[in-house]
Each structure stands twice: as structure tokens, then as C-alpha cells.
């Protein structure tokens, strides 16, 4: 049975939801697009909780009616058996709903609704690592496209064999960060490289960083801390390619973070894109510091988001992907084709379970 504290929390959520519903109908709000969007988003984030609470309330009414029927059917064995069976099903459903409600009330990550910059860097393994980084970029692009998200290449440094030394994807859509934040870490591949003449299996790595997009208000950058150089671009630019210096090489002196942007058509656009990436990187550093202080008090298997954490091994010979946090295997090819939902949902489930254990 749900605790009084849980029920009070749910009533508060319901009251807030109703208040936001009223505000959405306010003509003054309708004339302010930014405020309208903010309220609609806040209301939408509570909708699943309120619906589950209403389902739970209806279930409790059904339980009371079935218990009353059971008491009244003592003289009718057949009716009594039916009432007992229904009561058992309702109680099982009640337990499931209460678990769902508890999860829905867990503290939300304020970044969950944000778009992201997803950075993939080749690690150990030379050109094979760069090829692997390119494979990961394709995997995430396919996953994003399946969910109807938009993906564009924000920055790219290519390897000699066509792989990626470093790639940054800008991914926009519904709750992008909430799903992809558990992808941060070291992705290891075991396969025979295209450069291997003897057919031996090599191990290479690529590192994934997931950075929520932030605006200028959230991360303030002192212009004196920025050093910008320009260069001729080999990227998009039509007849301007290699004639006009459209590429931007940006250095943030306090941290040593360097961002090189060539993908836009003008120097101004590349400069704006480089600053956007820098803000995301600085914000991610801040999140890492916060996470490190939390992790010193508790050790969770998922959710640390550390760049150095080995999270997954992709084994081509055995046609399997092993997620080391879940201690679980998945078929390789569907994962590479962007079918990541089962894996990501398993990570979210484990994170929620660990968070529940911590809060209790």
C-alpha cells in the first residue's frame, strides 16, 4: 500500500498540473510565446505522473468493490473464487502502479530535456580507432533518425583512412539528453581491422562525451580568455573552399580546450558554432566536477558519465555487445544499426533502481 508521504506528493503534483492547465488557458499567457512554451513544457513533464495517479485511484476503487463482493459471496463458492482471483490480479496491478509512481517522482535531471553535442574521439588503436569512431557516429546518427531527432555534423577531424579522429554531432529533439547521457564513456571494439593482413583480432577504443547544449546565460565566457585563429576551410563553401579563411580554430586559454570548426559556410558561422561547442564543453566539465563529488559519497554503476569509464565492448567475432554496467549482452548488428532502445532503457532502469535504493 502506498505511503501517506507518497500520496501527499502525488496530490501536490496533481494540484500543480491543474494550476498549469488553467494558466495555459490564460489569454495573457497566449500572447507570450516564450511563457506559453515554458508552461506547456512544465505541464507535459507532469502528465504521465498525473495519469498514473488517476489510474491508481481508480484501481483502489475497484479493489474496494471487489473486497466488498468477496465478503458478500461467502455463501456462493463459485462467485467467491472469481472474486478472489480478481482481487489477486488487482493487488498485483496495484503493486506495479505504486512502483511506477515512485519512479515517476524521482528527482529529474534538469538537463534531461536539452539537446546535446555528442563528441566521439578515437582512442587507442591508431587508424582503426578512427574507423571505429566513425562507426559509432553512424550508430548514433541512425538511432537519432529512428526517433525523429535532427542530427548535423558540428565539427570533424578526419583520419587518413576515412575514419574520424574527432567528430562532434549536434542532436536535437525530444528529451535527447535523458536518453543519450548514459552513452558517455569508453567504447571498446574487438575485431579484425581492415589494415590487418594476418587476420588477427585487435582491440581499439573510442571515447564518447555527451554535452547538454547551454546558452550564454548558463555559461559566461570572458572574451579575454579566447584566442581565435582562422584558416582556409576544406568543408562546405562552394567556390570559396581553400580561397577564403572560413575555418575557425578557437582556444580557451584557462582550460586549454581547443575547438576547430570548418563545417559552416562562413567564418562568422564557424565562430558561432565553435563558441556553442566551447560552452557545451565547459558545462560538461562543471557537471563532471559535480558528479565526482557525488560519486565520492556513493558509487553508482550508471550515470557517472565519466570519459574514462569503460562502459561497453563490441565483439565482432562473437557478434555481441557487452554493457559492463548492466553485465548484459546484446546482439551486435542491431546495435550498430542504431537499435539502442532496449540497451538505453536497461541503463535508465538500473539508474532509477540505484537512485531509489540511495533515497530509501
Swiss-Prot record:
The keyword Membrane does not apply. It comes from the Bacteria. PROSITE patterns: RF_PROK_I. Methylated by PrmC. Methylation increases the termination efficiency of RF1. The modification N5-methylglutamine is found at residue 239. Keywords: Cytoplasm, Methylation, Protein biosynthesis. GO terms for molecular function: translation release factor activity, codon specific. The keyword Transferase does not apply. InterPro entries: PCRF (IPR005139), Pep_chain_release_fac_I (IPR000352), Pep_chain_release_fac_I_sf (IPR045853), Prokaryotic/Mito_RF (IPR050057), RF-1 (IPR004373). It is found in: Cytoplasm. Its main location: cytoplasm. GO terms for cellular component: cytoplasm. Pfam families: PCRF, RF-1. Belongs to the prokaryotic/mitochondrial release factor family. Peptide chain release factor 1 directs the termination of translation in response to the peptide chain termination codons UAG and UAA. This is Peptide chain release factor 1. The gene is prfA.
Amino acid at each position: 500500500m502506498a505511503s501517506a508521504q507518497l500520496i501527499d506528493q502525488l496530490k501536490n503534483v496533481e494540484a500543480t498540473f491543474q494550476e498549469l492547465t488553467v494558466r495555459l488557458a490564460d489569454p495573457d499567457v497566449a500572447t507570450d510565446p516564450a511563457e506559453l512554451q515554458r508552461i506547456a513544457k512544465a505541464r507535459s513533464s507532469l502528465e504521465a505522473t498525473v495519469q498514473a495517479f488517476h489510474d491508481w485511484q481508480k484501481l483502489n476503487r475497484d479493489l474496494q468493490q471487489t473486497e466488498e463482493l468477496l465478503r458478500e459471496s461467502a455463501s456462493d463458492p463459485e462467485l467467491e473464487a472469481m472474486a478472489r482471483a480478481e482481487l489477486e490480479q488487482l493487488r498485483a496491478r496495484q503493486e506495479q502502479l505504486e512502483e511506477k509512481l515512485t519512479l515517476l517522482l524521482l528527482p529529474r535531471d534538469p538537463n534531461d530535456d536539452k539537446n546535446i553535442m555528442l563528441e566521439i574521439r578515437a582512442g587507442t588503436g591508431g587508424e582503426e580507432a578512427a574507423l571505429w569512431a566513425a562507426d559509432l557516429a553512424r550508430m548514433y546518427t541512425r538511432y537519432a533518425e529512428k526517433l525523429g531527432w535532427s542530427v548535423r555534423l558540428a565539427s570533424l577531424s578526419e583520419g587518413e583512412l576515412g575514419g574520424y579522429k574527432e567528430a562532434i554531432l549536434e542532436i536535437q529533439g525530444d528529451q535527447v539528453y535523458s536518453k543519450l547521457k548514459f552513452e558517455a564513456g569508453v567504447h571498446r571494439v574487438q575485431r579484425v581491422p581492415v589494415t590487418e593482413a594476418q587476420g588477427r583480432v585487435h582491440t581499439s577504443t573510442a571515447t564518447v562525451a555527451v554535452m547538454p547544449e547551454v546558452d550564454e546565460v548558463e555559461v559566461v565566457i570572458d572574451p579575454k580568455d579566447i584566442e581565435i585563429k582562422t584558416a582556409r576551410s576544406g568543408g562546405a563553401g562552394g567556390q570559396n573552399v581553400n580561397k577564403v579563411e572560413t575555418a575557425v580554430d578557437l582556444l580557451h586559454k584557462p582550460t586549454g580546450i581547443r575547438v576547430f570548426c570548418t563545417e559552416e559556410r562562413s567564418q562568422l558561422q564557424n565562430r558561432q558554432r565553435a563558441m556553442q561547442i566551447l560552452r557545451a564543453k565547459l558545462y560538461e566539465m562543471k557537471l563532471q566536477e559535480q558528479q565526482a563529488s557525488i560519486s565520492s559519497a556513493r558509487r553508482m554503476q550508471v550515470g557517472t558519465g565519466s570519459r574514462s569509464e569503460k562502459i561497453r565492448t563490441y565483439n565482432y567475432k562473437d557478434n555481441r555487445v557487452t554493457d559492463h554496467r548492466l553485465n548484459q549482452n546484446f546482439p551486435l548488428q542491431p546495435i550498430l544499426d542504431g537499435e539502442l532502445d532496449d540497451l538505453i532503457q536497461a541503463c535508465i532502469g538500473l539508474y532509477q533502481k540505484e537512485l531509489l535504493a540511495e533515497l530509501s
